[in-house]
Amino acid sequence: MNPTETKAIPVSQQMEGPHLPNKKKHKKQAVKTEPEKKSQSTKLSVVHEKKSQEGKPKEHTEQKSLPKPASDTGSKDAHNKKAVSRSAEQQPSEKSTEPKTEPQDMVSAGGESVAGVAATSGKPGDKKKEKKSLTPAVPVESKPDKPSGKSGMDAALDDLIDTLGGPEEIEEENTTYTGPEVSDPMSSTYIEELGKREVTIPPKYRELLAKNEGITGPPADSSKPVGPDDAIDALSSDFTCGSPTAAGKKTEKEESTEVLKAQSAGTVRSAAPPQEKKRKVEK
């Protein structure tokens, strides 16, 4: 065996052998410390993550920087392959376990950051609320309580009534009358109207009625009862013309014939202009 080969084997064994248990121990510690990290502050968890992330790249660089032997026997090659396969299996297992721990730490850190932001944002809001609660305190006390069921006009009237104030109290005079008693000697008698009955008619008036002197009686009902036709004639009499002459009298039949002739002539005259227009268009 060459001295170079013997030196290379222990170096690889030293890197593969002692470092692997350290990784396992590190895994166990990470699993055990998960509940402890939740109870601790977020600062410690962030520092621990940074240290673990810084340690990983160093291990990978050391494994890559190791010199591989040029001439190895078949048994040594098989041993190296087994060691490499073990290290490759352990690396993804570490990667799979680490992301589980990171989100919890990030959630805890994020929760505290959100709580801190809420606490900082809550401070100015509290101040504003205190200012608002102090400012409307004075006018609320001065305003009277308004009933919710009333409209705007009723509420305005109530406000005006409140400004007027209550009614003034008038002191009642309890003085008693000490003078002489008042007596009313007057009496009332019912007298019937004169002429309401024959008994109450005065005697002189009866004599005048018997003589019928100086008394104008109602006119006699000589006129006939008036019907609707008579009323129409009486109303239309104001609009009639004077009586025509005897020579110019015409019968009703002649007047009706003249009216028909006038209507026919009017229709002919109105029909003539459209014919003239048609002739002009034809030309």
Swiss-Prot record:
Query: What is the superkingdom listed in this entry's lineage?
Result: Eukaryota
State the organism named in the record. Answer: Chlorocebus aethiops (Green monkey)
Instruction: Show the GO MF annotations.
Output: calcium-dependent cysteine-type endopeptidase inhibitor activity
Name the gene that codes for it. Answer: CAST
Protein name per the record: Calpastatin
Positions of the Inhibitory domain repeats? 170-222
- N6-acetyllysine: modified positions: 50
Q: Where is this cross-link: Glycyl lysine isopeptide (Lys-Gly) (interchain with G-Cter in SUMO2)?
A: 32
| One GO cellular component term noted in the UniProt record for this chain | cytoplasm
Q: Where is the composition biased (Basic residues)?
A: 21-30
Q: What's the short name of a Pfam family annotated to this entry?
A: Calpain_inhib
